[in-house]
């Protein structure tokens, strides 16, 4: 059984593109898949995988046809630690990281939205 939740973030600013988010939760396991993009193509190919370990979060990259950046790894680690689950992520946000404060705020809003999606799906 799985649960699919999709959300579009609109920042109300024509200079900041909308972000499309999809979260898939596999039940009864604790695996979570997260895709996010603010460009015309959806992320595909590689995934960052994080799993909670005994003392830290273990992270690896699952290589596919595309490539991922540090954002995918960062989000995967944050979500894995918070929810004590296996988290697979592929995030494609336009802009330079982490030096662009405007785009960095988009990442912050995206991760908040993903956390909200996961928490609200627990109660339903």
From Swiss-Prot:
Main location: cytoplasm
Native source organism of the sequence: Schizosaccharomyces pombe (strain 972 / ATCC 24843)
Domain of life: Eukaryota
Keyword Nucleus: yes
Family annotation (InterPro entries): PAC4
Keywords assigned: Cytoplasm, Nucleus
GO cellular component term, pick one: nucleus
Official protein name in the record: Uncharacterized protein C24B10.16c
Localization terms from the record: Cytoplasm; Nucleus
């Amino acid at each position: 059984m799985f649960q699919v939740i999709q959300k579009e973030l609109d920042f109300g600013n024509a200079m900041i593109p909308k972000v499309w988010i999809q979260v898939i939760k596999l039940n009864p396991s604790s695996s979570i898949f997260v895709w996010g993009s603010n460009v015309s193509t959806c992320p595909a190919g590689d995934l960052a995988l994080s799993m909670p370990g005994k003392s830290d979060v273990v992270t690896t990259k699952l290589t596919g046809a595309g490539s991922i950046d540090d954002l995918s790894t960062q989000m995967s680690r944050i979500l894995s630690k918070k929810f004590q689950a296996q988290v697979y992520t592929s995030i494609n946000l336009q802009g330079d990281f982490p030096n662009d404060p405007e785009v960095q705020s988009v990442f912050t809003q995206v991760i908040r939205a993903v956390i909200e999606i996961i928490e609200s799906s627990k109660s339903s």
